[in-house]
């Protein structure tokens, strides 16, 4: 949320150095910080910059949902030679999850809940809402599949498209602004490629 104080260095230095050096200089750095709505803070500390960072060539953007995503994606980010934005949702810090030994790679989404009637796609805290919604939909005999994007850039088109081809319906959940947002990009992928 104070990343805006460093945004020039993130966008114009870290993200562009590899290209400006003709591929000779890598910038292996991870910018890790809070993202999304927060509790009892001012407006400038409660917003979602996922789409904004995703617009920038040269940046990878990760947004974990649970402790497995956070642990594995952070390890992968540290090993990656590129600048990475690692967005954590403050309201998820106190959530309890079971830690597994699953390996997670940058660019791989997860089918968090299997389903056949509807695909719900989200990332970070939105996955929690999507899972809760899928449980309520079961009471109506609707089996929703939940996709945890994990990585916003590069985005896992295959997992999204495979699910939507199976269910023929999609809902995208995000906390960010709707205009030019992550949901708009996901819907564009579905409309153009499914």
Give each language-model segment a name.
Residues 1-4, 63-65, 176-180:
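Active-site nucleophile and cofactor-binding loops and adjacent substrate-binding regions
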Residues 1-22, 24-27, 38-40, 90-194:
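Thiamine diphosphate
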Residues 6-13, 48, 185-189:
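Alpha-helical scaffold elements adjacent to nucleotide-binding pockets in ATP/GTP-utilizing enzyme cores
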Residues 77, 81-83, 186-190:
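Glycine- and acidic-residue-enriched helix-capping/beta->alpha junction motif
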Residues 31-33, 61-65, 85-88, 146-147, ...:
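General beta-strand structural signal in soluble alpha/beta enzymes
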Residues 22-80:
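Conserved thiamine diphosphate
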Residues 16, 69-73, 104-108:
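Glycine-rich, charged/polar anion/phosphate-binding loops
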């Amino acid at each position: 949320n104070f990343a805006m104080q460093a945004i020039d260095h993130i966008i114009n230095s870290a993200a562009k150095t590899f290209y400006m050096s003709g591929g000779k200089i890598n910038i292996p750095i991870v910018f890790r910080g809070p993202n999304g709505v927060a509790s009892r803070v001012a407006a400038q500390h409660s917003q979602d910059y996922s789409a904004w960072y995703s617009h920038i060539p040269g940046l990878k953007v990760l947004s974990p949902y649970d402790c497995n995503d956070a642990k594995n994606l952070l390890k992968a980010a540290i090993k990656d030679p590129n600048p990475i934005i690692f967005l954590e949702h403050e309201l998820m810090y106190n959530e309890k999850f079971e830690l597994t030994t699953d390996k997670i790679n940058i660019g791989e989404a997860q089918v968090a809940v299997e389903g056949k009637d509807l695909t719900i796609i989200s990332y970070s805290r939105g996955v929690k809402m999507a899972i809760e919604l899928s449980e309520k939909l079961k009471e109506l005999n609707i089996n929703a599949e939940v996709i945890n994007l994990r990585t916003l850039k590069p985005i896992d088109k295959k997992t999204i498209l495979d699910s939507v081809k199976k269910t023929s319906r999609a809902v995208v959940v995000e906390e960010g602004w709707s205009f030019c947002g992550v949901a708009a990009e996901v819907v564009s992928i579905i409309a153009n490629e499914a």
